[in-house]
Amino acid sequence: MEFQKSPDGGWGWVIVVVSFFTQFLSYGSPLAVGVLYVEWLDAFGEGKGKTAWVGSLASGVGLLASPVCSLFVSSFGARPVTIFSGFLVAGGLMLSSLAPNIYFLFFSYGIVVGLGCGLLYTATVTITCQYFDSRRGLALGLISTGSSVGLFIYAALQRMLIEFYGLDGCLLIVGALALNILACGSLMRPLQTSDCPFPEKTAPENVPDRYSMYNEKEKNPEETMNFQDKGYSSEDKCLPNGDWGRETSLPKSLAIAAHTKEPETYKKKVVEQTNFCKQLAKRKWQLYRNYCGETASLFKNKVFSALFIAILLFDIGGFPPSLLMEDVARSYHVREEDLTMPLISIFGIMTAVGKLLLGILADFKWINTLYLYVATLIITGLALCAIPFAKSYVTLAILSGILGFLTGNWSIFPYVTTKTVGIDKLAHAYGILMFFAGLGNSLGPPIVGWFYDWTQTYDIAFYFSGFCVLLGGFILLLAILPCWDMCNKKLPKPAVPTTFFYKVASNV
């Protein structure tokens, strides 16, 4: 199916607005789950590691299921998937208000809401790319800030709703707000297909005889009509078994031919269908082999291999602060009256700023995007190691802002992937990297929570987080250093055969 040329405006700006609010409404609560995390600790009395699974699943499931999400969007379109996912997110949030234990939240909030968010992210990005070409970067940048603005607003909103209506009332109201995703999805008008005439229906006489099982009876109607002219008639007679039926008087040779040709035609068609199924299975197997071969070739690229390790370690260590920072402040005995603004809100607004500014920096030709990404990883690791030394609200707020800004490196990650594998392999490589990012999101907060349950302090937990991010940054830095290319150039070259080739000079 071919779509019209991207309009780069017009209704596309409506798509940008509704995609922004779709990400705002869907990701607002899961990204600001740190406010709910503190309440769940008090409500269910479970360990921090087990409780952290709720928020980590909500963020990681959508990334882990990104191939399935892409399949749904390509099969059904952005509008139906958005409306269906709106029901998933809203229903999951409302079900979470009825949770009797933490295990119920794993399903209702972690899996249902997480899967809905993953579907919505894929749908909004896909339809935005369809409507924009030359302004695609601007459009994607605008809609991606929806999740960061949602984190900023929902952190304060959920805290206020908990004070007035309790935890269950907060989840019910937030779930009701998520129903507005249905209205946003209804405005996602798909691009019309290119103006081309629909194929005409094939006339019965144009269908080859081999596709008709009973072609011997139908291909010569005049012969059938001549039966009456030749004196053959059909009369109602009582058949030998006592049933009444219509007995037709036909020549014996014609009746035998009809009965012998029909099974042969049927067998021929069965053989053709069997061969078609074999060819289809062979083709699918070849596609699977090609996919595995392309995946193996990607991991032969040392920079790509270092990149997947870096993104995995970055999400293991860098994601927990957005979930646990509120509980960190409480564990460091920061007074409630000192929390003038939720730390999660500061984290969210600075993430939006980081996405914008880092994206602008990546467009400068004199800046190497790979080195810029490595710099964000190393500074993030150092900031994580500094959290145990922050014992006041001001220092925690400063570190939250720094970590939020550096988390905005998600906006330059597609640039980094493109520079590593090329534009032709971008979709394949990006899907693999997003899978590992989802794995890191799912594992990071529980690991930090388990460290707290073991040591009763967040100090060792954030030292571990900082070490993971620093390790990933240095691995990627070593992979992209030009000294590796210099070493390869110094390797002895194979002996060149003593055969001379002469090329005729031409003026072409």
UniProtKB/Swiss-Prot annotation:
One matching Pfam family is MFS_1
Catalysed transformations (reactions): creatine(in) = creatine(out); (R)-carnitine(in) = (R)-carnitine(out)
Residues crossing the lipid bilayer are 13-33, 53-73, 80-100, 102-122, 137-157, 164-184, 303-323, 341-361, 370-390, 396-416, 431-451, 460-480
Using the UniProt record, give the first listed, main subcellular location: membrane
Could you tell me the keywords of this UniProt record? Cell membrane, Membrane, Transmembrane, Transmembrane helix
Give ranges for the Cytoplasmic compartment.
1-12, 481-508
> Membrane topology for this entry?
Multi-pass membrane protein
Would I find Endoplasmic reticulum among this entry's keywords?
Answer: no
A single GO BP term for this record reads:
carnitine transmembrane transport
- Subcellular location, record wording: Cell membrane
Q: Name one GO molecular function term.
A: carnitine transmembrane transporter activity
**Matches recorded under SUPFAM superfamilies:** MFS general substrate transporter
A cellular component term (GO) from this record? plasma membrane
Q: PROSITE patterns under this entry?
A: MFS
Q: Which family does it belong to?
A: Belongs to the major facilitator superfamily. Monocarboxylate porter (TC 2.A.1.13) family.
* Function statement: Extracellular pH-and Na(+)-sensitive low-affinity creatine transporter. Also functions as a pH-independent carnitine efflux transporter.
Query: This protein is called what?
Result: Monocarboxylate transporter 9
Q: Which organism is it from?
A: Mus musculus
